[in-house]
Amino acid sequence: MQAMDGEVLLPALYEEEEEEEEEEEEVEEEQVEKGGSLGSLSMGKHRGLSLTETELEELRAQVLQLVAELEETRELAGQHEDDSLELQGLLEDERLASAQQAEVFTKQIQQLQGELQHLREEISLLEHEKESELKEMEQELHLAQAEIQNLRQAAADSATEHESDIASLQDDLCRLQNDLDDMERIRGDYEMEIASLRAEMELKTSEPSNLSISDFSGIQDELHHLRERYNLLNEEYQALRESNSSLTGQLAELESDRTRRATERWLESHLLRSTMSSESQTSELDFPEPDPVMQLLRQQLLGAEEQMQDMQDKCKNLYCELEELQHHRRTSEEEQKRLQRELKCAQNEVLRFQTSHSTQQHEELKSRLCTLQQKYDASQDEHSELLKVQMQLETELQQLRLLRCTPVESQSEKELMCRLQKLQAQHQCSVNEKEQLLEVQHHLHDKLRCHESEVHRLRSMVDCLREKNEKNSGIHLQLQEMKGLYQFSRDELERQKHMYDQLEQDFLLCQQELTELKSSQSLCEENGNCSNKCDALLARLTELQDKFKASQEEIGHLQMEQCELLEDQRRLQEEQGQLQEELHRLTFPQPKCGILQKSQELLSKLQDLCEMQLLYQNMQEQQRKLTQNQECVLKEQLEAHKHLRGFKESHFQEVLANPQDARGPKSSSCENKFKVLMDQLQALQVLYDTSQKQQEVLQREHGRLMEERKRLQAELQLCMEEMQVLQTQSPMIKRSFEYCGKNSGSRAPSTENFHRSYESSIDENEGYQKSYVSSQPSTETFLKSYDSSTSANEAFEKSYCSSSTSVSYKKSYGSVSSGETLHRSYASSSTDEDPAEPEDLEHFEETVAKVLTKLQAVKALYQVSQEEHCQLQQRMHRLLAKQKELTEELQCCEKELRECMESLGKPLPPQSDKCEIKELQTKLRELQLQYQASMDEQGRLLAVQEQLEGQLQCCQEELRQLKENRPSISSEARGKNVNKNMNKNANGVRNKKLSMACSEDLENGFENEKNLEVMLYYKASQRRLDELMKEEKEIEEARKKEREKKAKKDLCKLATNPAADPRAEPEPTEDEEENFEEYREGEDESCEAAEEGNPLKLSESKKPSPAPDPPIFSLPLVGLVVISALLWCWWAETSS
């Protein structure tokens, strides 16, 4: 309001000053006239003093006039003084107003300075906030990367664990299949044995008169073999059960580990989701627009969850397979139990057959065997075809083994076997190495994909950070411009203050001059000086008024500039908000004239893609040819197998028809056939090797084709994206072209505001171009990588099987990194381009249509090639399975053929050996009967030994009671008398028992031995008795072990040497006598030692004992109990 008052006062002051200037001009004119009159008077004075009275009166009148004029001038001076005082008041008023205005201006300046300081603080706070937000975003990115790495590691660990589990399960499957094969083989053996038993039963029923002891011995041998096999089968069954239990335990542990890991991963994913949801909520509150990094992280988390779901599905499938395997194992166990039951029934029937001699029992056994065979045949219909071949081979092998001919192998056959084994080992090693290489290759491909995705993500982050840095640099430049403007306004204010100081100084000088004018009123000469001074003062006042006006105009300009600065600041704030919005949604720029070139480049690259697809189809045709070659090889293998089977069947039929000729030396025809078969086997082995190499080459090429297919997919996706961009740009291009056509003539700038708006629009277009340039690296890198991939395809076309494709692939992969530099140059050139021309826009739609048609054609070709590739892969898998089966059959056939050819070359034993074999079988039968009787006697003697041990324990308890009841040393004599009486009683008893036969009941002998041992117990001291008991127990255990070993050795000798003379049977009695003599000597020594150590003696008779006492608490072995009892009876008789 004060400024407005000042502005209102200025025109009134200007009008007053103009009126004063007019008055001053009139006064000056009057003074000039008065000066002329005074000059004329002075000239008259100088002319002469001789003047008349009239002249004096005239002079007086003139003087009066002059006095009157002086009074007038004085009045005028008074008026001027009043005017000057008024002017001084006005000046003081103006000075006060200017001081007030200066105070107002200073306050405004201070306010502006405070606002600027506040803005600086706000800008610094915003910068700090942005930096903190950037740091937080970087930390969040690092955390997200760490979490992604952890998830990847967990997924890799789970994949490795699943792979290891799958490998272990596959091993278990193989082992179970082997066990099943073994069970089938054993079942075949059982069938063969049952068939042989049936044949023997039929022979025996048909020829009952021919039954002899040799047949029974043979049946017993077979029983022995069956028992051994039964034991072996039981052991195998236990081992299988233990392995199954261990497998179930491992499966339970795996299931627990998987459930635990699944829960841990679920908890981690749940925590990640919660954290991500909270972060997303906070970010939405702070910044309502979505963050691309967070979206990428969410997509990665969703992908990880999908992978976890896939892994869980795989686990479920594995569990189903395990359940099927367990069911298969249970069925195999049930079959094994059923076979064991049938075997036991057959054994029982055989035993019954051995003990039976009537025809009715034979017929019953035959009927039972027939029923069992029918049941067994009904249960084994599923495996009938394979088992027939195995049964024939097993019967022939058993017939050949019965001939007991030593195998004779030639050197050529041994060398061939060694070669076969080496080739099989090499084949297995190559297969294992190939599998390892494939696993390593897949692992490296996965790593490469992960690194590429991370590189793309990091590049996008770098581009975003660059855009943010560029915008921050623009904001900093604007802030520096604001600072410059503020400094300039500050300098202007200082200059105005300086001008105000100068005006005050001039005003003070004017006051001093006015005071001097007031003092100067005495003389006329001083009047002229006063008028001069007044003129100077007036001129000075006018100058001051001009300077004041100029200063006021400058202040108005400064106010206008300050208003413009505030408007610019608001506009900058609005532009900053628009830039922040553009950060989140990058819009595409106006089209340039390089779009047509880009579309043409796309067309050329799509043509290259079509060429690559045709190359891929040619490679698929070559792969088809290779599969056809493999099918031919497999057909040849099948023909060879058929030939082998026919040869085996014909040869076996010849052997069965005339066995004498088969047992003789090899014929020339057999040798020729064998050589032909071996040549065919070698040729098949060579074919197997070549097919294996071709398969390796095919697998390598398959991996390369898969890589190229992935690249093609990426390129097609990028092409589709670019076409979508071009389609979205096409309406914008048309609009821009129409707008340019309308405004082509009105481009000349009219005002500065138009220039500013035009410059701001140019800046916005540049920002759009920057954002568009930031969105172009992916397309540029795609173009570069595509060029490099075409070079790789040309190299691959030149060398189909060489490794140059891998080198070119590496180059193409390395050239992707150089895509950025090309993109930068392209971006720098694209910013300087001109708008699109109408000719380019006319051809644009045609190029877009061509590109779309090419894309559709490439897509169709790709789908067709993918379907063909799937079909080829299925055929390859089938052929590989057939090839494995055929290799296994070929190995089995080779082994069987070699065994047959070796068995055909063995000579037959003479017919004289048959009689010897029968004699040996009869002798063996007799020995087995004797052994059975001895075993029965041994059991009976063991029962007697147990009774004796019970009686000895009773005696020991009675002795302890007697020891406790002994009162003193005087009772020792009584003990001696009692001993003597007991000795006499014992001798009497022994004399009586000598009169009886030694071969009668053994209980009396054991009672005598008991009495003797009781008697000797009273003679020995307790400590010595304990020591002797321990020694005797150890000796008895050692001797028992030795006897058992000798008995086993004797049985083995009898079984191995059946042709020994039966007269050598009484030899064991001599051995027993020798053992008995050694035993007696040991007993003598122990008895003498006991008599020397004891204060008591056996008896006080004069005759010395011819035989010493036996060891105390001696428990003789089963075979020597009776002999020791008889010996003690003889010693008692001699001593009496």
Swiss-Prot record:
Residues with PTM Phosphoserine: 50
Biased composition (Low complexity): 976-989
Recorded coiled-coil stretches: 293-631, 681-730, 839-972, 1017-1057
UniProt keyword annotation of Transmembrane helix present: yes
Record InterPro entries: Cent_Immune-Sig_Mod
Predominant subcellular localization, coarse grouping: membrane
Comp. bias regions, Acidic residues: 14-31, 1067-1091
GO cellular component: a single term: acrosomal membrane
Tissue spec: Present at high level in testis (at protein level).
Spans through the membrane: 1112-1132
Cellular compartment(s): Cytoplasmic vesicle, Secretory vesicle, Acrosome membrane
Start and end residues of each stretch annotated as Disordered: 1-46, 741-773, 814-837, 965-990, 1040-1111
Entry keyword annotation includes Phosphoprotein: yes
Biased composition (Polar residues): 743-752
Bilayer topology annotation: Single-pass membrane protein
Function: May play a role in acrosome formation in spermatogenesis and in fertilization.
Protein's recorded name: Coiled-coil domain-containing protein 136
Name of the gene this protein is made from: Ccdc136
